[in-house]
């Protein structure tokens, strides 16, 4: 695939990431086949649910300090944690693909962030054979899984 197309599809994934209601991390994904977008996704709660993707976990541990709130006239620290019901961008794109007349077989996925191992399994199951991502993730098990499955992985 030509670099100009890679850049265009990655920019598109970034634009869809901006649609996420998440505060901590916004992720976008685009599935492409024959230089044509066949599915998109971004991280968020299921359709019809409250769009709040994170919970505030209040803590006393200074190491957890992420943000502060005034609660009952006292400043308290909290950490935002992603709700378990949040669907990852890759999973959203693949589930939309499954509900369409398109197939991911031999397609490419463009993701703003490296996939987790669970999303990597979905990518493999969808028959996608190339993954492009922009930002690394602290856990490389998703990339390791894709590489082990002989899926071409490119950081752009």
Which residues fall in each region the model found?
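Zinc-dependent deaminase catalytic domain
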Residues: 1-156
């Amino acid at each position: 695939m030509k670099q100009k197309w890679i850049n265009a599809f990655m920019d598109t994934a970034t634009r869809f990431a901006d649609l996420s209601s998440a505060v901590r991390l916004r992720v976008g994904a685009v599935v492409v086949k024959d230089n044509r977008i066949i599915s998109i996704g971004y991280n968020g709660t299921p359709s019809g649910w409250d769009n709040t993707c994170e919970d505030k976990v209040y803590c006393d541990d200074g190491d957890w300090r992420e943000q502060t709130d005034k609660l009952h006239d006292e400043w308290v620290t909290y950490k935002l944690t992603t709700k378990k019901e949040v669907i990852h961008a890759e999973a959203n794109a693949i589930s939309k693909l499954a509900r369409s007349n398109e197939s991911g077989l031999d397609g490419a996925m463009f993701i703003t962030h490296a996939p987790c191992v669970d999303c990597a399994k979905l990518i493999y199951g969808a028959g996608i054979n190339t993954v492009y991502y922009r930002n690394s993730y602290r856990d490389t098990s998703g990339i390791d899984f894709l590489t082990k499955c002989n899926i071409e992985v490119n950081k752009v």
